[in-house]
């Protein structure tokens, strides 16, 4: 007899820190009550990997190509059924932003020392911004590499 498996629905989403040497891309959402700077973000679509989601969301929201996509960590979002997965990636080519005005009000590059931060916010986005600002985005290497 086959067992029935009942699970809660979980929606995978990515938070993306796009970096270009000493700069990180930050944005403000369009049409939302939250008006502070954040990283790019979006939901995975059926049939794509989260790495493909990273590249697609960056292209859709700001028109940039990225490379060297690397996982940072995840966080369940308590206000919804979303599992946030944080990634850093590097700019691949031209840094000229083509903004999707339906999604974003603004997107701009910030030098590490000029990054606006909110130390009190307990979120994956804020943690990733602080990690980059404090120069801690390198992937940990195993001994012998």
Predicted regions and their residues:
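Short, small-residue-biased leader/transition segments that mark boundaries at the very start
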Residues: 2-6
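Extended interfacial segments that mediate partner engagement and assembly in macromolecular machines
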Residues: 7-51
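Structural beta-strand/beta-sheet cores of well-ordered domains, especially the beta-sheet scaffolds
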Residues: 12-14, 22, 35, 62, ...
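Short loop segments at secondary-structure junctions
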Residues: 21-23, 30, 90-94, 112-114
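Active-site proximal loops enriched in glycine and acidic residues that flank catalytic Cys/His/Asp
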Residues: 28-29, 39-41, 66-75, 91, ...
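Nudix hydrolase/Nudix homology domain
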Residues: 33-37, 100-145
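The catalytic Nudix box helix
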Residues: 39-73, 87
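Active-site-adjacent beta-strand/loop module that shapes the phosphate/pyrophosphate-binding cleft
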Residues: 75-98
């Amino acid at each position: 007899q086959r067992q029935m498996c009942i699970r809660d629905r979980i929606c995978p989403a990515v938070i993306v820190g796009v970096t270009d040497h000493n700069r990180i891309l930050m944005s403000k959402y369009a049409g939302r009550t939250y008006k502070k700077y954040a990283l790019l973000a979006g939901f995975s679509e059926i049939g794509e990997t989260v790495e493909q989601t990273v590249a697609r969301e960056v292209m859709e929201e700001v028109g940039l190509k990225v490379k060297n996509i690397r996982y940072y960590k995840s966080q369940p979002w308590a206000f919804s059924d979303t599992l946030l997965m944080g990634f850093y990636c590097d700019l691949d080519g031209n840094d000229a932003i083509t903004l999707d005005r339906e999604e974003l009000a603004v997107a701009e590059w910030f030098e590490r020392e000029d990054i606006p931060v909110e130390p009190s916010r307990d979120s994956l986005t804020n943690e990733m911004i602080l990690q980059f600002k404090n120069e801690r985005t390198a992937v940990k290497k195993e001994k012998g590499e």
